[in-house]
Regions:
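HotDog/MaoC-like acyl-thioester-processing domains
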Residues: 2-13, 68-69, 80-122
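Generic hydrophobic-segment detector
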Residues: 16-21, 60, 67, 110
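Hot-dog-fold acyl-thioester-processing enzymes
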Residues: 2-54, 114-122
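A contiguous binding-surface segment within folded domains or other stable secondary-structure elements
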Residues: 40-96
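A broad, structure-centric signal for solvent-exposed, well-ordered loop/edge residues
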Residues: 20, 24-25, 35-36, 65-70, ...
């Protein structure tokens, strides 16, 4: 893989929390957050190696605070480390309160990706 700076793998995504994405308490579903984290991190990994990647593992996924219907999830990711066969991507999620504009850190995770060729091999 070519050596590039973490800033070149940076991805910023935003998602509006809708009722279909929430539980009975009006909080976003953890599975929805995990899905968005995986997408955001995968884009960083793709930008880094310019090749197909697969998620190998998710480490240290921490849900720090709930996010509510109508709030904005703000996801940021970049490659933290790249080895010979895999790379670690860090993802941070902040939630912007739709009424006040106040941001709070709501989740973080580290994901490991592996680059694969057109035959699905590493």
């Amino acid at each position: 893989m070519n050596s590039i700076s973490p800033s070149q793998s940076y991805v910023h995504m935003q998602e509006l929390i809708l009722p279909n994405d929430s539980n009975i308490l009006g909080n976003v579903l953890g599975g929805k957050v995990m899905h968005l984290m995986d997408l955001c991190a995968a884009m960083s990994a793709l930008k880094h190696c310019r090749n197909q990647v697969v998620t190998a593992s998710v480490d240290n996924l921490d849900f720090l605070a709930p996010s509510k219907i109508g709030d904005f999830l703000i996801l940021k990711s970049s490659v933290n480390f790249c080895g010979n066969t895999s790379m670690e991507v860090g993802v941070r999620i902040d939630t912007e309160d739709r009424k006040t504009g106040i941001l709070k850190h709501t989740a973080s995770a580290y994901l490991t990706f592996v680059a694969i060729d057109e035959n699905g091999k590493t």
